[in-house]
Amino acid sequence: MVESSKQNLDALKDEYKSVQRGYLPKLDAGASYSINEHEYPNNPKKRANAYGSINYMLYDGGKKYDIYDGYETNIKSGEKSLDALKNNLSLTVIQYYFDYLSLEAKKDAKQKEIEQLTAQEDRIGRFYNAGTTTEDELQKIVSRLQNAIVELQEIELNIITITHNLEYITGTQVSIKDGSKLEDINNLIQKNPRFDIQALDFVTQSKQSVAQAQKSGYYPTVTLDNTFNYYDSNYDNSTFKDPNNHQNIASANMKWNLFSFGQTKYQYESKQKEYLASRSNFEYEKNKADVDLQLALKSYNIAKAKIKSTEATLKAAQSAYEIIKSKFENGLIDNVAFLQSLTEKYDAISQHKKAINDLEVKKATIIYHSGEKLQEYIRW
């Protein structure tokens, strides 16, 4: 995707160079040879002709500079679109990366839960074989263990899916390791709109230049021409011979369209309306982007609060689990309370780690909406 956008941008730059070269003087050359059936004073039996001409558009009604402005803003738009694409991909990769870490934390918690359930299955199984507990007590543990195993498989599938998605985006095999974070954004100041909004602004400016270029139809065009011809005439009748064998013609030409049934007017109005439509769309998208940034800032503050909340939940769940586990193993409570406490403990562990990872995604979202390059904020 990025390489394709680069190629399109390079193609636009080459096209602009071609247009610029088109306004430079043009030099042409040509030659001809003819044999006529009948000979006349101005029509020899045989004639060879060679010519060279130079042509220059001195003035085109001001259209040239509007065309130049249009190409330059289109190129700037292409550059910002490329930055927007890179930033979009960076944000997507960051989201996948921290989702992957959250799933790995969830997987680790689930594996530890399975270890605890397996140990309790063995313990209750021994009591059941000894006749000191009922079968339903054992089956509750077995059922919870099987559910945990299925949940682990689902987590592993989600991890594989993220890995494949990252490989699709990057085009290479990926190996994900923990440790990457984003720089602190407390001092981040929005200097520019989002890259796609900047690109849209340049597109709008380009349409304005195209509209202005239509006004050139109201003004004359002036060209300068110089043509040199060389003749080699071969007459059978020597009285027809002309002593002159060359001719040079220099001319200055002006063309001014005085009336065209409103063609120029309607061309301008058409392009002007396209510009106004683009300007309206730009203002809408710009306002929407401002709202997106404000929402991202609020989400970031909520994410910070969620970390504190999940941390408190985790401490409570761990404390409750240790107490309930001790009571359960001493036969003071049934396994329903124990299983509930076990699930809450490991859910709290994974939720806390997920909250930490989600905060990094929220930071990335703010950087993205602030018109900054995400790659410059990643700490490996």
Question: Language-model segments: which ranges?
Answer:
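Bacterial Sec-pathway N-terminal export signals of envelope proteins
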Residues: 1-28, 132-136, 167-212, 219, ...
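Small/polar-residue-enriched beta-strand and adjacent coil segments characteristic
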Residues: 26-85, 202-207, 217-285
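Periplasmic alpha-helical coiled-coil/stalk elements that build and connect Gram-negative outer-membrane
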Residues: 86-198, 203-205, 211, 296-299, ...
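A short glycine-centered flexible hinge/capping loop motif at secondary-structure junctions
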Residues: 128-132, 328-332, 369
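Short terminal targeting/anchoring segments
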Residues: 136, 332-354
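C-terminal structural cap/anchor segments
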Residues: 267-309
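C-terminal hydrophobic structural anchor segments
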Residues: 296-334
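Acidic, low-complexity, intrinsically disordered peripheral segments
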Residues: 351-380
